Swiss-Prot record:
Belongs to the AVIT (prokineticin) family. One of its GO terms (biological process) is endothelial cell proliferation. It comes from the Eukaryota. Disulfide bonds join C26-C38, C32-C50, C37-C78, C60-C86, C80-C96. The keyword Disulfide bond applies. This is AVIToxin-VAR2. One of its GO terms (molecular function) is toxin activity. It is found in: Secreted. It comes from Varanus varius (Lace monitor lizard). One of its GO terms (cellular component) is extracellular region.
């Protein structure tokens, strides 16, 4: 009899558990807004989320495809904003930097 009284309480506790809702989940760049790409999540590698394009001084990956990219990205960073390039700052380290054009 006591177990019958505990069953509804147990169900109430189970249904009140915490859960996560992932916003901005995507598969391809075209599902994200302007100035964003669909990059691999830092926390859950099997999920891609809409991520802002790299700003000046932010980390980048030199092999990131331009936006929009029709396939699935393999990195957690987006390419740099259009007026920036992904330049090497030290061995194995790249950052979004201003694009210097040759004036000659």
């Amino acid at each position: 009899m006591r177990s019958l009284l505990c069953a509804p309480l147990l169900l109430l506790l189970l249904s009140a558990g915490e859960s996560a809702v992932i916003t901005g989940a995507c598969d391809k760049d075209l599902q994200c807004g302007e100035g964003m790409c669909c990059a691999v999540s830092l926390w859950i590698r099997s999920i891609r989320i809409c991520t802002p394009l790299g700003s000046s001084g932010e980390d980048c990956h030199p092999l990131s495809h331009k936006v929009p990219f029709d396939g699935q990205r393999k990195h957690h960073t987006c390419p740099c904003l259009p007026n920036l390039v992904c330049g090497q700052t030290s061995p194995g380290k790249h950052k979004c930097l201003p694009e210097f054009k040759n004036v000659f």
